[in-house]
């Protein structure tokens, strides 16, 4: 597994405003959207392309286009939905699948409650959208779900990550014969006793959409 922390002043600027507890939900959604687009630029450096011949107003030339099968973008519900538009801005022709996962706040274990994905993901590059890589349980379960269906290349885009979550991913994905890359805006200090990232930005889903009881 490879972890890439994006070092860019605009990324740091937007992340700082996301962290601020005074940032309201509409502003938080806009900043998250902008930040994901910046992260997506780094995350798609290995996106597969194929050659294509085109004719410019001056002469014929050879360029590239996204290879088939097209990439699959998979937001983890619900907070991952807040990252979808920012990702699709760079990959408008990608397919979108959905994976609903929930974390038990007592055991910190993740379980799947909904999915809308192709049955066969053989040969597919998958981009998983999960704003907070905290304990790592949700993302590990999502990656296993995708690889069980044949995905052969997975990149996860996270607004924030914690060292404990990355360590758990390394452990749970050990022996997995599929390249996995984590792209994040920051590696924070630690998790607290409730499994939240410190200093973090709070609950991403609540801050995106408001608290739903």
UniProtKB/Swiss-Prot annotation:
Keyword Acyltransferase: no
Binding site for 5-phospho-alpha-D-ribose 1-diphosphate: 78, 103, 130-138, 203
Pfam families named in the record: UPRTase
Activity regulation, short description: Allosterically activated by GTP.
Cofactor note: Binds 1 Mg(2+) ion per subunit. The magnesium is bound as Mg-PRPP.
GO BP annotation list: UMP salvage; uracil salvage
Cofactor: Mg(2+)
Residues bound to uracil: 197, 202-204
Pathway, per record: Pyrimidine metabolism; UMP biosynthesis via salvage pathway; UMP from uracil: step 1/1
EC id: 2.4.2.9
UniProt keywords, alphabetically: Allosteric enzyme, Glycosyltransferase, GTP-binding, Magnesium, Nucleotide-binding, Transferase
Catalytically driven reaction(s): UMP + diphosphate = 5-phospho-alpha-D-ribose 1-diphosphate + uracil
InterPro entries named among the record's database cross-references: PRibTrfase_dom, PRTase-like, Upp_B, UPRTase/APRTase, Ura_phspho_trans
Task performed by this protein: Catalyzes the conversion of uracil and 5-phospho-alpha-D-ribose 1-diphosphate (PRPP) to UMP and diphosphate.
HAMAP family named in the record: Upp_B
Similarity comment text for this entry: Belongs to the UPRTase family.
Protein name: Uracil phosphoribosyltransferase
UniProt source species: Nocardioides sp. (strain ATCC BAA-499 / JS614)
Taxonomy of the source species: Bacteria, Bacillati, Actinomycetota, Actinomycetes, Propionibacteriales
């Amino acid at each position: 597994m490879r972890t890439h922390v994006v070092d860019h002043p605009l990324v740091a600027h937007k992340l700082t405003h996301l962290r601020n507890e005074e940032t309201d939900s509409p502003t938080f959604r806009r900043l998250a959207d902008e930040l994901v687009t910046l992260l997506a630029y780094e995350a798609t450096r290995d996106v597969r392309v194929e050659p294509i011949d085109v004719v410019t107003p001056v002469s014929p030339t050879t360029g590239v286009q996204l290879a088939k099968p097209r990439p699959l973008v998979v937001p983890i519900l619900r907070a991952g939905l807040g990252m979808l538009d920012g990702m699709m801005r760079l990959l408008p022709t990608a397919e979108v699948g959905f994976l609903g996962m929930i974390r038990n706040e007592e055991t910190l274990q993740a379980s799947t409650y909904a999915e809308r994905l192709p049955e066969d993901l053989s040969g597919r590059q998958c981009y998983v959208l999960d704003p907070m890589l905290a304990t790592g349980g949700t993302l590990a379960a999502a990656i296993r779900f995708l690889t069980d269906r044949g995905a052969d290349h997975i990149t996860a885009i996270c607004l924030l990550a914690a060292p404990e979550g990355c360590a758990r991913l390394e452990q749970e994905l050990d022996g997995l014969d599929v390249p996995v890359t984590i792209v994040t805006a920051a590696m924070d200090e630690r998790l607290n006793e409730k499994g939240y990232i410190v200093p973090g930005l709070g609950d991403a889903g609540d801050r995106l959409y408001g608290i739903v009881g």
